[in-house]
């Protein structure tokens, strides 16, 4: 809550949050967590959906309750289940801007209703991915297919050592050392 309020004072356009990672268990816990953050500012709020950790049980009931929370204007959907993305889009319509959270599916997810993507590998390939997504949405499916197959090959190669790769890539590309991961 303090970080969300600080972000608002800094003039950001919106805030986001992962679900309660250490004390998960049910939809009520996730929705209470999101409500407290969303209600602490007037900023648009984009909760993360991380697989079954943040939408346990009935997805439609969860989305219905999520839409009742003030300032919720979208979601990041980190799932490989394209049917779930479509289902949420069909239920929420224009009430939620959906973002793909699975880098390896960002073109695929646009066909299911996402308006953009948020992910790890965009820190390195952001401009290329943005270009491909724009082209894909405008009908250049050949470019989308070719890029996605190559991008997925890279992701598959890097994934076992993703943090080491990302740390070195960020240092080489931006001269930013993002440091080692830390235990909670």
Kindly label every feature range from the protein language model.
Residues 19-28, 137-140, 181-184:
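Glycine-rich tight-turn/loop motif centered on a GG-T
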Residues 19, 47, 69, 79, ...:
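Generic secondary-structure boundary/loop-capping signal
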Residues 4, 106, 167:
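Short glycine-/small-residue-rich flexible loop motifs, especially phosphate/cofactor-binding loops
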Residues 1-2, 14, 95-98, 178:
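Helix-coil boundary/capping segments in enzymes
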Residues 110-113, 152-184:
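Conserved short secondary-structure transition element at the edge of the structured enzyme core
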Residues 1-55:
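Active-site beta->alpha loop and helix N-cap motifs at the rims of alpha/beta catalytic domains
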Residues 39-40, 51-159:
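Catalytic alpha/beta core domains of metabolic enzymes, predominantly
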């Amino acid at each position: 809550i303090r970080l969300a309020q600080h972000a608002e004072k800094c003039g950001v356009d919106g805030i986001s949050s992962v679900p309660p990672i250490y004390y998960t268990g049910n939809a009520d816990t996730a929705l209470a967590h999101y409500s407290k953050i969303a209600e602490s500012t007037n900023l648009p709020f984009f909760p993360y959906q991380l697989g079954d950790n943040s939408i346990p049980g009935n997805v439609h009931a969860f989305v219905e309750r999520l839409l009742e929370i003030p300032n919720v204007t979208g979601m990041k959907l980190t799932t490989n289940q394209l049917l779930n993305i479509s289902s949420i889009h069909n239920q929420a319509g224009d009430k939620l801007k959906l973002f793909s959270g699975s880098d390896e599916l960002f073109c695929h997810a646009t066909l299911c209703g996402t308006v953009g993507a948020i992910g790890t590998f965009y820190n390195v390939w952001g401009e290329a991915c943005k270009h491909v997504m724009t082209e894909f949405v405008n009908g250049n499916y050949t470019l989308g297919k070719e890029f996605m197959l190559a991008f997925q090959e890279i992701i598959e190669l890097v994934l076992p050592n993703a943090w080491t790769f990302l740390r070195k890539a960020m240092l080489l590309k931006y001269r930013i050392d993002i440091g080692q991961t830390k235990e909670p």
